[in-house]
C-alpha cells in the first residue's frame, strides 16, 4: 500500500517553515549559584505553558457541562470533575515531557513517525477537533457579548465581532511569549474572580461540596446522570490540547545536551501544570456548585416565576412556565443568575464567559499553527494562518446562527460539538502514548512500564466512555432505526479500523508487539531524525543507555 509506507508529503509542500518558537524568543532559564532541588526563580521561568494548556479545561464547553451537571445531579458529580482533572494532569505531563525530551512537538513527530496517508488522516481529524472547539468558543463569546449588551447586540453580530480576536492575538503575540502568557493568566484570574463571586453569593452547602468531591459515588443517579458524568469527562480531556502542550514547552530554552537540565525542566513543568490545573479545577467547581445550589430539583416554572419581576434582564421569559425539570445552558445560566441576584450577577457571569471564550480562541489559534507547522509544513506568514483558522471556525458558526433562529436554539449545540471532539480523542491520545513509550524518540526518558500500562488503561477507558456517549447521543437524537445504522455503519467501521491501526503502532512502541512483524500498510522502521544529545555513549545493555 504505497500511501501507507514510504511516500513523503514534503514532495507536496516545501519543508522550510516559520518556526513559532526559536532560540531568539525562547525564555532563558536562570542558573542558580546553589545546587538546590527547588528554586522559585526557576519555577517562575518555567511558569506559563501550563496556564495556556489549562485554558482547554475552562472553555465555554466545559463551563456548560459543569452547570448542567450541577442542575441535574447537585454536588454528586464533583468527584468526576476531580478524577478527570487528575487523569488530565497525568496525560498532560506526558505531553510536556515529549516536547522537552525530543525537542519537537507531537505534530512534528507524527510527520516523521507515520506514513503519508495515516498522518494526513490524523491531521484532518485534529483540524476538525480544533474547529469544533473554536466554534464552542465563538458561540460562548457571542453569548457573553449578547448578555453584556442586554440583548442589544444579536448573536450573529457577536460572532462577527469575534473576528477581532484574530487581530488581538496577532497584536499581543508581537510582544513575545511572556506577555502573551501574562494575558492568559489575567483572563484566568478574571474567570476565577467572576465565578468565585457567584460561588460566594450563592452560598453552596460546603459540607455537600466536600462530600461530592471526595466520595466517588452518585446515590440515586440514573442514566441521565451517568451521561452527564461522561460529558464532564469528555469535555475536560481535549484531543488538541496534547498537541498544544507539547509545543508550548518549547518556548523555554532547555539545554538538551544535559540530562540534568532535561530532568529539571520535566520537574518544573509538572509542578506548574499541577498548579494550573488545580486552579482550573476550583473554577469548574465554583460553576458546578453555583447551579447545584440554585437549580437542583427546580422546575422551569420555578425559575419563570422568579424572572417575572425582572424587566431589566434580557429574555427573562426564556424559561417556559411548566413543571418540567429545568434545563440550562450558558445563556440560560446567565439569565437565571440575573433573575436570582440582579443584573450585576448576570454581567459578572457574562464577563467570566467572555474571558473563557477569549482565552480559548487564542489557544485554539496557537494549536492550529502548531498542527499546520508539524503535519503540513507549509511556510505561511503567521497572520495568514491565524485568519484562515478563524475563518474556518466562523463560517459554520454563522450558518448555524442563521438556521438556529435565535440564541435560545443555538446554545444546545454544545453537546454535538463535544460529541465530535470525543470522536477525535483517540487520534491524539494513542499517538501521545506511542511517542512517549518509544525508545527511538524518548530514549532513556521513555515512560516506565507501569506508566505505559496505566496510560493504556486510561486510554481504553476514556475511549470507551466517549464511544458510549457518542452512541447515546446518536440514538437519542436520530433514533435506533435500521437506516441510521446503515448510514453510520461504514463510517464506524473505518473509524474503528484506523484506531486499531494506530493501536498497533502503540503496541510496538510499548514492546507489547514485535516490530519485525510484516504487516501490509505498516512501516515500523521509518527513519526518525530525533537525536539524544544528552547521551555521550551510544551502547545499550538491557535497554539501559550508558
From Swiss-Prot:
Q: Which stretches face the Cytoplasmic side?
A: 1-42, 92-119, 174-181, 250-270, 356-386, 437-453, 505-546
Keyword Lyase, does the record have it?
Answer: no
Q: Which family does it belong to?
A: Belongs to the NRAMP family.
- Sections of the chain in a coiled coil: none
Set out the biological process GO terms recorded for this chain's protein. Answer: intracellular iron ion homeostasis; iron ion transmembrane transport; manganese ion homeostasis; manganese ion transport; response to manganese ion; response to metal ion; transition metal ion transport
Q: Where are the transmembrane segments?
A: 43-63, 71-91, 120-140, 153-173, 182-202, 229-249, 271-291, 335-355, 387-407, 416-436, 454-474, 484-504
What gene is it encoded by? Answer: smf-2
Where does tissue-level expression of this protein occur? Answer: Expressed in dopaminergic neurons (at protein level). Primarily expressed in mc1, mc2 and mc3 epithelial cells of the pharynx and vpil-6 pharyngeal-intestinal valve cells displaying an anterior-posterior expression gradient. Expressed in gonad sheath cells.
User: Where in or outside the cell is it found?
Assistant: Apical cell membrane; Cytoplasmic vesicle membrane
Known PANTHER family for this protein? NRAMP-LIKE TRANSPORTER SMF-2, SOLUTE CARRIER PROTEIN FAMILY 11 MEMBER
Its name, as the record gives it, is: NRAMP-like transporter smf-2
* GO terms assigned for molecular function: cadmium ion transmembrane transporter activity; iron ion transmembrane transporter activity; manganese ion transmembrane transporter activity; transition metal ion transmembrane transporter activity
Bilayer disposition of the protein: Multi-pass membrane protein
